A protein has these predicted regions:
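Charged, amphipathic alpha-helical linker segments immediately N-terminal to NTP-binding catalytic cores
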Residues: 1-26
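Charge-rich, solvent-exposed alpha-helical interaction surfaces
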Residues: 12, 16-19, 353, 370-373, ...
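Short, flexible helix-adjacent loops and helix caps
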Residues: 68, 223, 362-363, 469-476
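C-terminal end of P-loop GTPase domains and the immediately downstream helical coupling element
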Residues: 212, 221-226, 232-403, 407-409
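N-terminal J-domain/J-like co-chaperone modules of DnaJ/Hsp40 proteins
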Residues: 406-500
């Protein structure tokens, strides 16, 4: 009889928590271990962060597939809001005094007022019967002020982490298992400013494997042309500057993505677009879609002003142009338009990252975060009654880390060091780290091809062995290089065994 498969990563770490709790008395150490255990039992937390008015809440709505998050400046956009699965659907406002107020949704959306001043609110938790939230929790954060001078001395000033809202966002990022970060449209990248983004990772377990950047509102890039084409070189330049910090930079038109995903576009809206497309003279069309005011006031359009305003709120001018071209191409039904909007928004690439990569690797991300928290707990000094029990965590933690079956946890440690700027690598080795930590199955990195996969894995191990043994390497660099080398050696061993 074959041996039973090892328990999931999170189950092993949860058992470690239980073993420790059996010996811990009430105090800071016990509280920390209890919190670690509790977090292992909830879905992966994906935090959405970015600059003020960068489109965070709009993107959250697209991810959730419903228009729930507040997008207008108001109380809800100034607090951390977490979306979790739950029934009945409700809003729980957590005060700084620990009191929780329960509110109902207002026609399926966040209430306009939260019942207390925002400076007295610690966080807001929204429970929804939403399919995505069965697998992940999504956190919407207040905007960071990303328009300060690029030569500010501190990253906190550059990112706007000064004041209560910035501190709340930084705290949410530090607690995240995965991060979606919205960046402004940077036509001229500044390496120092962009690398400053990685400072948000301080104190967290985030890495390029668990982080992606979104170039938002790219529809404002090209008037008359395809903004996604205009955004591609900008995204490439930003991705190069953030290489090792995020897994990629994805251009997205958030409003189109929200309209395509959030079940707000109706057959009546499709008929309204047919009326817009009926203005078929090219010059008249250009005049009608020049500005929002031009569209609202165009005399030759047989459409009520309220209908025009609704279309603008869902599509904006670029979306209207996309819709008109789609109508010319034969689109008639709401379903036709939704497919067009989804494709034009660029959202599919982000959805793949969130649903397939982040949710697919939730076991690894959660276990990695939990083990880092437990390691910190083992060094607590302000809990003398639990000192011995906390120190006892170190040995079993090391055993889990050294288990070949859990090597993915150690690979994440390398990616985390790269993201935090504590490990600088040559380009070829950096590519290895990004590839191994981003792939759900690391073997795909070397290409599972008979006779060649083994050679590629052996070559990878050789590259890292050479770097590890370079006398210029520090002890930390050598240790992390050894982790990468062992990852390739494990793949080589698997391929070699199959070949036999």
């Amino acid at each position: 009889m074959p041996p039973a498969p090892p328990p999931p990563m999170s189950a092993r770490v949860r058992q470690l928590c239980d073993d420790a709790l059996a010996h811990l008395v009430p105090g800071p150490g016990r509280t920390m271990v209890e919190q670690v255990r509790a977090k292992l039992s909830v879905p992966l937390t994906i935090t959405v962060a970015g600059g003020v008015s960068s489109g965070k809440s709009t993107l959250v709505n697209a991810l959730l597939g419903q228009r729930i998050a507040a997008v207008d400046a108001g109380e809800c956009t100034r607090v951390v809001t977490e979306f979790r699965y739950g029934n009945p659907e409700r809003v729980e406002v957590v005060g700084t005094d620990g009191v929780v107020d329960v509110l109902g949704l207002a026609r399926g959306r966040m209430p306009e007022h939260l019942g207390r001043p925002t400076d007295e609110i610690s966080s807001v938790v929204v429970y929804l019967s939403n399919a995505l939230l069965n697998h992940v929790a999504v956190v919407d954060t207040p905007g960071l002020n990303t328009v300060t001078e690029v030569n500010e001395e501190t990253t906190s000033n550059f990112l706007g982490i000064s004041g209560r809202e910035g501190e709340l966002t930084a705290g949410a990022v530090s607690r995240a298992d995965a991060l979606v970060f919205l960046l402004p449209l940077l036509r001229q990248s500044d390496a120092d400013a962009l690398r400053g983004f990685s400072k948000l990772f301080g104190g967290s377990t985030l890495s390029s494997a668990s982080s992606v950047a979104v170039l938002s509102k790219v529809d404002r890039l090209a008037k008359g042309g395809d903004p996604m084409l205009a955004a591609a070189p900008i995204a490439g330049r930003v991705a190069a500057e953030l290489r090792g910090v995020v897994s990629g930079v994805i251009p997205v038109i958030g409003l189109l993505a929200e309209t395509a995903q959030a079940a707000v576009f109706t057959e009546a809206d499709a008929l309204a677009l047919a009326a817009v497309a009926a203005v078929d003279d090219p010059l008249d069309r250009d005049d009608m879609l020049l500005t929002s005011d031009d569209f609202l006031g165009f005399d030759g359009l047989d459409l009520e002003r309220s209908q025009r305003a609704r279309l603008l709120s869902m599509l904006d001018l670029y979306g209207l142009k996309v819709a008109v071209r789609a109508t010319d191409g034969g689109a008639r039904t709401a379903s036709d338009f939704l497919k067009v909007f989804d494709e034009a928004s660029g959202f599919a690439s982000l959805r793949e990252v969130v649903v397939q990569r982040f949710a697919g690797q939730s076991e690894v991300f959660k276990a990695h975060a939990a083990m880092n928290d437990l390691r910190r707990a083992s060094y607590l000094r302000n809990d003398p009654a639990n000192l011995r029990a906390l120190r006892a965590l170190r040995s079993p933690l090391e055993k889990i880390e050294l288990d070949p079956a859990l090597h993915g946890l150690r690979l994440l440690e390398v990616a985390q060091a790269v993201a935090a700027g504590t490990l600088a690598l040559p380009e070829s080795l950096l590519a290895d780290v990004l590839a191994l930590t981003a792939a759900p199955d690391p073997r795909s990195v070397v290409g599972v091809v008979a006779g060649r996969s083994s050679e590629a894995a052996a070559a990878g191990a050789k590259r890292w062995a050479a770097w590890e043994n370079d006398p210029r390497r520090s002890p930390v660099e050598s240790r992390l290089a050894r982790v990468m080398k062992e990852g390739y050696e494990m793949m080589w061993s698997e391929f070699d065994e199959v070949a036999r």
